[in-house]
């Protein structure tokens, strides 16, 4: 009996020692192994939540479209119902953002950049539910927004959540897990692991602290999120455009011309985004009722637009293969391009929870395809394929607007599985970036972050001025 008791006590002591060792390992902030393990956890969680977000948005969209199909034969019901359903869904997203987590509005990528510099708060307990449910509303309503921005912000906030749950106190761990979550989020949104890594290194280069531990953590998180994505969605490219032909050397100058066009379009697009943001701010003045009603009106209009021309509504992933295949005329491509520019400005600049990556990729595809079709008519001797210009255009607008050409190139190649077009992609994106920089254009996300920080400083200064007055009272 005594032997059994002593054996049991010995086993208990061993278990307690193991638990103590694991706890100490997790609490040693400078242990690379602990950070890498946490990065794997962050990547896995981000992949799971990213897939869940994608499925949830698709479910809401299918439910909305299914309700419209039921009344498709009754025009007097169809049009009002399309407006009302999309308006109500959009209002849910706008209300949640404005009421509970204003930092969850828009793409969320500038918020992650600010958090990496310790300039913006990371309230993951608010942002995660608001961004997820709010994004279901706005994206499910058919608004011209993408899911990549929300997934990046969700990933970054999951990184901070894991840090807080495991009580890792070091600044290095805090910074690394936030960046890891953001990279894993982009990878989970686009099934583009290398683009997720490059996005952190290139787009967030002023904020990202590049060292051996941080880059290994980012790699680990991205690998895990990509594995999770492929378990649920398979390994096929996220955008199916088929295998396109190579670009002959004697046609490469046309891609430089296309890059020059996007180099002009990019700064203009950024300027329009910022001006539209100012217009909306003047309209609602921060008043929640006006803001929600405005969002509902925009969502309802997107619902109506989806009936008139489905290609002009939604994030754009369904539009890209159709446009790249040359199924539209040049005139219709330009019409859809202009329409989607307007709807992108209205949806994104109004502060709806949703990203701008996917809409920009769709815009680049439309303009690139139109250019390719026109070039095929003007230069029949080249036997040009418009789809190759569509692929080049996808990354070019992003390169000119966000000022991340390498990310744009790799992202598009991973999404379409057309790696043979890497040379024309480089020429187009480099030309677009250089001209945009020469024209004085500023990177979109950095500019939005600067405006957010200026507003934050102004609000803090106002509070400091009011504090003495309140004390005297």
Curated annotation (Swiss-Prot):
Q: Which UniProt keywords apply?
A: Antiport, Cell inner membrane, Cell membrane, Chloride, Ion transport, Membrane, Transmembrane, Transmembrane helix, Transport
Task: Give the matching InterPro entries.
Answer: Cl-channel_ClcA, Cl-channel_core, ClC
Coordinates of motif Selectivity filter part_3 in the sequence?
A: 355-359
* Known role: Proton-coupled chloride transporter. Functions as antiport system and exchanges two chloride ions for 1 proton. Probably acts as an electrical shunt for an outwardly-directed proton pump that is linked to amino acid decarboxylation, as part of the extreme acid resistance (XAR) response.
Gene3D superfamilies per UniProt: Clc chloride channel (1.10.3080.10)
Q: Where is this site: Mediates proton transfer from the protein to the inner aqueous phase?
A: 203
Q: Which residues lie on this side of the membrane: Periplasmic?
A: 70-76, 233-252, 309-329, 379-386
The record gives the membrane topology as: Multi-pass membrane protein
Intramembrane ranges in this entry? 109-116, 177-189, 190-192, 193-201, 387-401, 402-404, 405-416, 417-421
Motif mapping: Selectivity filter part_2:
146-150
Q: Give the family this protein belongs to, as stated in its UniProt record.
A: Belongs to the chloride channel (TC 2.A.49) family. ClcA subfamily.
Q: So which stretches are on the Cytoplasmic side?
A: 1-32, 117-123, 167-176, 202-214, 282-287, 350-354, 439-473
Q: What is this protein called?
A: H(+)/Cl(-) exchange transporter ClcA
Q: Where are the transmembrane segments?
A: 33-69, 77-100, 124-141, 148-166, 215-232, 253-281, 288-308, 330-349, 355-378, 422-438
Q: Which reaction does it catalyse?
A: 2 chloride(in) + H(+)(out) = 2 chloride(out) + H(+)(in)
Give any Pfam family that matches: Voltage_CLC
The compartments listed are: Cell inner membrane
The encoding gene is clcA
The residues that hold chloride are 107, 356-357, 445
Q: Where is this motif: Selectivity filter part_1?
A: 106-110
Gene Ontology molecular functions: antiporter activity; voltage-gated chloride channel activity
| SUPFAM superfamilies referenced in this protein's UniProt entry, alphabetically | Clc chloride channel
One GO CC annotation, please? plasma membrane
Mediates proton transfer from the outer aqueous phase to the interior of the protein (site feature) positions: 148
Q: How does it assemble?
A: Homodimer.
């Amino acid at each position: 009996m005594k032997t059994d008791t002593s054996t049991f006590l010995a086993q208990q002591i061993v278990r307690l020692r193991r638990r103590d060792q694991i706890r100490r390992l997790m609490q040693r902030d400078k242990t690379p192994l602990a950070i890498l393990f946490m990065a794997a956890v962050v990547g896995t969680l981000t992949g799971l939540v990213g897939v869940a977000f994608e499925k949830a948005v698709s479910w809401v969209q299918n439910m909305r479209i299914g309700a419209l199909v039921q009344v498709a034969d009754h025009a007097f019901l169809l049009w009002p119902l399309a407006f009302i359903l999309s308006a109500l869904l959009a209002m849910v997203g706008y209300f949640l953002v404005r009421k509970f987590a204003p930092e969850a509005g828009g793409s969320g990528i500038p918020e992650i950049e600010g958090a990496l510099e310790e300039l913006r708060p990371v309230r993951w307990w608010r942002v995660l539910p608001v961004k997820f449910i709010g994004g279901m509303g706005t994206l499910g309503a058919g608004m011209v927004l993408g899911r990549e921005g929300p997934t990046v912000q969700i990933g970054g906030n999951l990184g901070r959540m894991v840090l807080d749950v495991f009580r890792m106190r070091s600044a290095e761990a805090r910074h690394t897990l936030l960046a890891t979550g953001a990279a894993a989020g982009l990878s989970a949104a686009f099934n583009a692991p290398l683009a997720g890594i490059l996005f952190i290194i290139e787009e967030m280069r002023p904020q990202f602290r590049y060292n051996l531990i941080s880059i290994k953590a980012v790699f680990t998180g991205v690998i895990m999120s990509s594995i999770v994505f492929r378990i649920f969605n398979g390994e096929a490219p996220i955008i199916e455009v088929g295998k396109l032909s190579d670009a002959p050397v004697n046609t490469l100058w046309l891609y430089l011309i296309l890059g020059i066009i996007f180099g002009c379009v990019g700064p203009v697009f950024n300027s329009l985004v910022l001006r539209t943001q100012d217009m909306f701010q003047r309209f609602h003045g921060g008043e929640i009722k006006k803001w929600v009603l405005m969002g509902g009106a925009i969502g309802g209009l997107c619902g109506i637009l989806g009936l008139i021309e489905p290609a002009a509504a939604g994030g754009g992933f369904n539009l890209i293969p159709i446009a790249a295949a040359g199924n539209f005329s040049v005139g219709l491509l330009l019409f859809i391009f202009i329409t989607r520019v307007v709807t992108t400005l209205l949806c994104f600049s109004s502060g709806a929870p949703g990203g701008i990556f996917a809409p920009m990729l769709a815009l680049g595809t439309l303009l690139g395809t139109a250019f390719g079709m026109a070039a095929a008519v003007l230069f029949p001797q080249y036997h040009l394929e418009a789809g190759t210009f569509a692929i080049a255009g996808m990354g070019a607008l992003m390169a000119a607007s966000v000022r991340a050409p390498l990310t744009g190139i790799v992202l598009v190649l991973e999404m379409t599985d057309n790696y043979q077009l890497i040379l024309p992609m480089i020429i187009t994106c480099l030309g677009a970036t250089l001209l945009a920089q020469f024209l004085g254009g500023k990177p979109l996300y950095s500019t939005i972050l600067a405006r957010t920080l200026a507003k934050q400083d102004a609000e803090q200064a106002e509070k400091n001025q009011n504090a003495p007055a309140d004390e005297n009272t």
